[in-house]
Structures are given as structure tokens and as C-alpha cells.
A protein has these predicted regions:
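Walker A (P-loop) phosphate-binding motif
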Residues: 1-35, 40, 113-115
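Glycine- and other small-residue-rich loops at beta-strand/loop junctions that grip anionic moieties
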Residues: 5, 73, 153-155
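Short beta->alpha junction loops/turns
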Residues: 6, 47, 98, 156-157
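Hydrophobic (often cysteine-bearing) scaffold residues that line and stabilize catalytic clefts
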Residues: 12, 73, 160
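Aromatic/hydrophobic pocket-lining residues that form π-stacking "cages" and hydrophobic walls in ligand
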Residues: 16, 80, 164-165
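ATP-dependent carboxylate-amine ligase catalytic core
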Residues: 22-109, 121-132
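Acidic, Mg2+-coordinating active-site environments of NTP-dependent enzymes
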Residues: 67, 87-95, 111-169
């Protein structure tokens, strides 16, 4: 389950996790950023990865990467998916990064679902000057969600909701 949006992604993941845990469904969680420790980004079977597990994953990724350029977020995401491959029966709750279209988390061919939390004007400065508007943010966050069932949370305006519906339909 991919969670995209501007605000509410982490709390949505925590709510989904609580619901699935109550139903005895095992989950993996990938979030960003972290608050206290990088380990909190990685949860498998209700447990954060410990330092040794994380270091081992980083070493494996570094070895496989062959000194190719890679961002910090791509390393973390690769570590998550590498570990998640050991828990294939679990549901993955994945918080996307800044935008979804070119995000490192956007590698799955299908999703059980995608959840669009509230969309806002944060991160406009990451867009080209002539594209700094809410429609472009919506496009960047939702245009690649066409491979799954899409759930749209209540938005701050009808215009945003309508724009999301237009892009994902």
C-alpha cells in the first residue's frame, strides 16, 4: 500500500498499521523522515530493524551498486525492499518521498492500494519556476498511481479533489 500526499502520510500509516495488526495481518512499514533514529523508518513484524541488520543491508546494497551514483533516499529504499523480500506474505505500508512520479519507492508494478492524503503547496521550490502550482504537485504525487486501487482522503478544497480525480482517471 503506497501512501502519497503532502500531510498525514505517517499518521495514515500508523492508523492502517493498527487496523491490520488488530486483524492479525502482518505488516512492514517504510517511512521518512525519521524523528529519533534511522531505524524507525524500517518496521518488519512489529519490530524496528536494529543497527546490525541495517548496516548489513547497507553493505549489501553498496556491494551490488558497483559505485554507481545513488542518493541517500535510494539507499534507504533499496534497504527496505531488500529486507521486505524476506517477508513476502506481509503487507507493505510505504510512505513515498517528496513526489511519487520519480520516487525511489515507485518501483512496484501493482499495489494492493494507494492512499492519497491531503495535498498542499509544500515543496513548490522543487518544481521548475513555470510549474510551481498545485496542479503540478498533484500530477507529481498521483500520476503514477494508475496501477492500483486508489483511495483519496478528504482534501482542503473541491478544486484539489477534482484535479486528483482528473489525473488518476
Amino acid at each position: 500500500i503506497s501512501i502519497v500526499g503532502t500531510n498525514g502520510k505517517y499518521s495514515t500509516i500508523q492508523a492502517m498499521f493498527a487496523i491490520l495488526k488488530e486483524a492479525n495481518i502482518k505488516c512492514n512499514i517504510y517511512t521518512s523522515p525519521h524523528i529519533k533514529s534511522i531505524n524507525e523508518r524500517f518496521v518488519f513484524n512489529n519490530q524496528e530493524l536494529n543497527d546490525e541488520e541495517l548496516a548489513s543491508l547497507f553493505e549489501e546494497i553498496e556491494s551490488a551498486n558497483n559505485n554507481e551514483p545513488i542518493t541517500f533516499f535510494e539507499i534507504l529504499t533499496a534497504a527496505y525492499f531488500l529486507k521486505a523480500s524476506q517477508y513476502q506474505d506481509n503487507i507493505n505500508l510505504i510512505e513515498t518521498g517528496l513526489f511519487h512520479r520519480f520516487d525511489a519507492t515507485n518501483i512496484l508494478k501493482t499495489n494492493l492500494a494507494s492512499i492519497v492524503t491531503s495535498i498542499g503547496l509544500d515543496h513548490l521550490d522543487w518544481l521548475p519556476d513555470n510549474e510551481q502550482n498545485v496542479e503540478k504537485i498533484i500530477y507529481e504525487k498521483t500520476s503514477t498511481l494508475l496501477n492500483s486501487n486508489i483511495i483519496v482522503a478528504k482534501q482542503s478544497s473541491k478544486e484539489i479533489t477534482d484535479s486528483i480525480k482528473k489525473i488518476i482517471s
